[in-house]
Amino acid sequence: MSQNQETRGFQSEVKQLLQLMIHSLYSNKEIFLRELISNASDAADKLRFKALSNPALYEGDGDLRVRVSFDADKGIITISDNGIGMTREQVIDHLGTIAKSGTKEFLTALGQDQAKNSQLIGQFGVGFYSAFIVADKVTVKTRAAGEEADKAVLWESAGEGEYSVADIEKKSRGTDVILHLREDEKEFLNEWRLREIIGKYSDHIGLPVEMLTKEYDDEGKECGEKWEKINKSDALWTRSKNDVSDEEYKAFYKHLSHDFSDPVTWAHNKVEGNQAYTSLLYVPAKAPWDLFNREHKHGLKLYVQRVFIMDDAEQFMPNYLRFMRGLIDSNDLPLNVSREILQDNKITAALRKALTKRSLQMLEKLAKDDAEKYLQFWKEFGLVLKEGPAEDFANKETIAKLLRFASTHNDGCEQTVSLEDYILRMKEGQKAIYYITADSYVAAKNSPHLELFNKKGIEVLLLSDRIDEWMLSYLTEFDGKQLQSITKADLDLGDLADKESETQKQRDEAFGSFIERVKNLLGERVKTVRLTHNLTDTPAVVSTDNDQMTTQMAKLFAAAGQPVPEVKYTFELNPEHHLVKKVADIADEIEFADWVELLLEQAMLAERGSLENPAAFIKRINKLLG
């Protein structure tokens, strides 16, 4: 008999997710069982952990399991566990809302492409709501461990905008999820179909999955029913890696991560000695939807002596490797370990160092063995890996080897060039690795600063990710070679520089008075004015000194709301350009000023992508064209 019944509306994001899921996941329906069994496994893990300090929570039943049964006549499948269970408040929090920041924005971003939506929703993690892929009504009966039998809760919904919740009596702790299948989903009301799905997705979770099977006597007559364990239910990571197949590793990854895609690669290691632990690390194929969300939870599952302790233990991985998935099972940490204890712990620090090294080795091996797969990985996680040089000084050189960039060596904008590739192609006498940063690949590719390098056939890395400038403030050299921006006024090409000819010397002297006129006109608005022979097609550029903040870094500061120090540019003019020659011959000071201002504004526009006063620029162009 239910009491205290109320009907509540789903959070708007839940409604939207349910509709998207029903229409986008029709080709992958069977994952509902994987998700619900994974939830049951999590509930068992949480009970084990809480029972460490309060054994009474077991209520005399410490054999944790999940049971799957079906009734073909009634059209229902039931998934029951004897795990931690839920209170009424927890039911409303967990089954009526999605407590993930950024969910609304994520759902809004989903388009009409159902195949793409399927993949994105898989990255989001649908969990309990996957039940509605096959069911037109879902009933949940649950009682939290340690609560009285009359403190159980009944939750029910048809997935159409609202749900009901009521108090009921339930003798056993844990949760029963009852699925009332749609008419066209009756294929799942079959013992062998359910066994197949459980074997495929849940064979190696650390919890027995049982099904009710018929018993027969010696004469072959049905004589009853019994619960039969149908999965291996061993902790996969405790087995020798030689005894685990690739398919088993992939299936376990999907259980662990709730991801739909296979991982790119994985590493399974058992370490003995001062630190005894087992790790199983995976590199995902796709970035999670909230990878760059500050509140995004990441980290490894932590076990101590095979006992689950916590999800998302971020203390074992640096932030720039937050995309890594997997688990660590330590023999040395105490069973009562907390996040606070992990924060300042020598064992944690040693494990973090070892797991970081292992993760980087996995990526190095992937880059070496399968360049195509590595580039797929780079497209998904390259921006995150670029955080590494600033965060991890000890592994900076290793991280630098894993970075990929666009370059003038290639035609496209794909980031495929490593620093090692670049060094192999360096010109004789070249001492630095040259790069340029810009707002976009197109802006970098067409920068006038490239003209001399293109003429000499010197490769330049084209950097256009927002993080690049910040990364390069920490990554200043690689393999003994300085990384040098080609937009700097004090750029030194060393042996690659052209020797000044007598003709150039005479021309420069002839332009001396012109340079002085420009300096007097611009005054304090620029640091200095000078001639340059680094341009071929462009009349003028602006550049900064090595000790000054670059244009891109100034933009980063401004975007972050930080105060931006004034940047004074060096104004460089090309004496061989016909426009500069024309301006140098203008006697009228007003006309001269207009042309100099125009050249400066053009150079500033090419460097910064914008002007402080675009209206004045347009007015000046119109005046000079008229």
From Swiss-Prot:
- UniProt-annotated stretches for the region B: 340-555
Region: C; residue ranges are 556-626
> Which InterPro entries is this protein grouped with?
HATPase_C_sf, Heat_shock_protein_90_CS, HSP90_C, Hsp90_fam, Hsp90_N, Ribosomal_Su5_D2-typ_SF
Tell me which domain of life the UniProt entry assigns to the organism this sequence originates from.
Answer: Bacteria
Per the record's keyword annotation, is Translocase included, yes or no?
no
The answer on whether this UniProt entry bears the keyword Transmembrane reads no
What cellular component terms from Gene Ontology apply here?
cytoplasm
Q: Where is this region: A?
A: 1-339
Q: Which PROSITE patterns match?
A: HSP90
Q: Name one Pfam family in it.
A: HSP90
Q: State the compartments where it is located.
A: Cytoplasm
Keyword annotations from UniProtKB, A to Z? ATP-binding, Chaperone, Cytoplasm, Nucleotide-binding, Stress response
- One GO molecular-function entry: ATP hydrolysis activity
Subunit (UniProt): Homodimer.
Q: Which family does it belong to?
A: Belongs to the heat shock protein 90 family.
Protein task: Molecular chaperone. Has ATPase activity.
Q: What is this protein called?
A: Chaperone protein HtpG
